[in-house]
């Protein structure tokens, strides 16, 4: 399903009441490159709540650790990808790790870490955008401009960040 909030579109797939896949908030012209489906005109309250939380993550208005307490989700990924994403979940708001940092922890290559991150079905909720290359931003499925935007928002909000109560 795709839910529109203001000018943003957020794709989500649920199994039962658990979120198993989402997109970051995108413009109408971008969303269908990342998710098939129709825009739901009257989403269920629970689905709308999840979309609103994802939008807050995009603008760095809430910490992903808090979100993982608010949203029921399930990771359906291969074991290695899960190990990578478990490390990524621990990267603090406003901070980054390199692909190499994670690779050392798992005794693997930075390229393998990058491939695992590309499989992250829950971007923003599991903050793969916080993983960068040694001397650059690295890659991001949604484009480096969006990765840079999210990281800049997090750094700006980190100094005076007060976690707003969400629902």
Curated annotation (Swiss-Prot):
Alphabetical list of PROSITE patterns matching this protein: MGMT
Compartment(s) of residence: Cytoplasm
HAMAP family on file: OGT
Class of this enzyme: transferase
Superkingdom of the organism of origin: Archaea
GO cellular component: cytoplasm
Family: Belongs to the MGMT family.
Catalytic activity: a 6-O-methyl-2'-deoxyguanosine in DNA + L-cysteinyl-[protein] = S-methyl-L-cysteinyl-[protein] + a 2'-deoxyguanosine in DNA; a 4-O-methyl-thymidine in DNA + L-cysteinyl-[protein] = a thymidine in DNA + S-methyl-L-cysteinyl-[protein]
EC number: 2.1.1.63
Note: This enzyme catalyzes only one turnover and therefore is not strictly catalytic. According to one definition, an enzyme is a biocatalyst that acts repeatedly and over many reaction cycles.
Keyword terms: Cytoplasm, DNA damage, DNA repair, Methyltransferase, Transferase
Chief place of localization: cytoplasm
Functional description taken from the UniProt entry: Involved in the cellular defense against the biological effects of O6-methylguanine (O6-MeG) and O4-methylthymine (O4-MeT) in DNA. Repairs the methylated nucleobase in DNA by stoichiometrically transferring the methyl group to a cysteine residue in the enzyme. This is a suicide reaction: the enzyme is irreversibly inactivated.
Species whose genome carries this gene: Methanocaldococcus jannaschii (strain ATCC 43067 / DSM 2661 / JAL-1 / JCM 10045 / NBRC 100440) (Methanococcus jannaschii)
UniProt keyword Transmembrane present: no
GO MF term (any one): methylated-DNA-[protein]-cysteine S-methyltransferase activity
InterPro entries with a match to the protein in the record: MethylDNA_cys_MeTrfase_AS, MethylDNA_cys_MeTrfase_DNA-bd, MethylDNA_cys_MeTrfase_DNAb, MGMT, OGT_N, WH-like_DNA-bd_sf
Active site (record annotation): 128
GO-annotated biological processes: DNA alkylation repair; DNA repair; methylation
Protein name: Methylated-DNA--protein-cysteine methyltransferase
Record keyword Mitochondrion present: no
